[in-house]
From Swiss-Prot:
The gene is SNO1. It catalyses: aldehydo-D-ribose 5-phosphate + D-glyceraldehyde 3-phosphate + L-glutamine = pyridoxal 5'-phosphate + L-glutamate + phosphate + 3 H2O + H(+); L-glutamine + H2O = L-glutamate + NH4(+). One of its GO terms (biological process) is vitamin B6 biosynthetic process. Catalyzes the hydrolysis of glutamine to glutamate and ammonia as part of the biosynthesis of pyridoxal 5'-phosphate. The resulting ammonia molecule is channeled to the active site of a SNZ isoform. InterPro entries: Class_I_gatase-like, PdxT/SNO, PdxT/SNO_CS. Pathway: Cofactor biosynthesis; pyridoxal 5'-phosphate biosynthesis. L-glutamine binds at G67, E68, S69, R129, I160, R161. This is Pyridoxal 5'-phosphate synthase subunit SNO1. Belongs to the glutaminase PdxT/SNO family. Pfam families: SNO (PF01174). GO terms for molecular function: glutaminase activity; pyridoxal 5'-phosphate synthase (glutamine hydrolysing) activity.
Length: 224
């Protein structure tokens, strides 16, 4: 389904990029490297930090990390990377995963919109930022993701000024993967998939030594 790069020896390989403009890119990189050290995915996979259009051009998949969506958007525009990111995420042959701020950056519509956040507009969802409150209301919750990741229950999902998906604008294309209540009442979507695009409102990269989510991402989206 996805294009591969070829090494000099002729073996196929894929490159997972981690956008390194701002935010938790090191944590994502460390989780990915641990997955590659502990598992065989059947193909050669390389991890690359992405700061320039040249970096991005080498990637088959891209992770947009959690952080600060306004800063991420402004840096991408100021450095000239935004048009390349836009083209990448709208390419159906590329894989994209956005966590927290990455979810905001990928979304088509913001409920509490900021003029400073120029989103990439690829995921047809309506997102509300800081749905659980500010930094002081951040929390970690044990979640059961076994309905889409076999054996992935009791996963420590960390929500930091987390966005949520209030409305799926294209329910035919966008599939809800995980829902949870906000303030004990309204149920909102915290993870969705649209073919080659995955988003989570929480931070799997902050789950210490638990790499199950990243392992599933590699198997489901990159190595298949």
């Amino acid at each position: 389904m996805h294009k591969t790069h070829s090494t000099m020896s002729g073996k196929s390989m894929k490159v997972i990029g981690v956008l390194a403009l701002q935010g938790a890119f090191l944590e994502h990189t460390n989780h990915l490297k641990r997955c590659l050290a502990e598992n065989d995915y059947g193909i050669k996979i390389e991890i690359k930090t992405v700061k320039t259009p040249e970096d991005l051009a080498q990637c088959d998949a891209l992770i947009i990390p959690g952080g600060e969506s306004t800063s991420m958007s402004l840096i991408a525009q100021r450095t000239g990377l935004y048009p390349c990111l836009y083209e990448f995420v709208h390419n159906p042959e590329k894989v994209v995963w956005g966590t927290c701020a990455g979810l905001i950056f990928l979304s088509a519509q913001l409920e509490n919109e900021s003029a400073l956040v120029k989103t990439l507009g690829v995921l047809k969802v309506d997102v509300r930022r800081n749905a659980f409150g500010r930094q002081a209301q951040s929390f970690t919750q044990k979640c059961d993701f076994s309905n889409f990741i076999p054996g992935c229950d009791n996963f420590p999902a960390t929500f930091i000024r987390a966005p949520v998906i209030e409305r799926i604008l294209d329910p035919i294309a966008v599939k809800s993967l995980y829902e949870l209540p906000v303030n004990g009442k309204d149920v909102v979507v915290a993870a969705t998939q649209n073919h080659n695009i995955l988003v989570t409102s929480f931070h799997p990269e902050l789950a210490d030594s638990d790499t199950r989510f990243h392992d599933w991402f590699i198997r489901q989206f990159v190595s298949n």
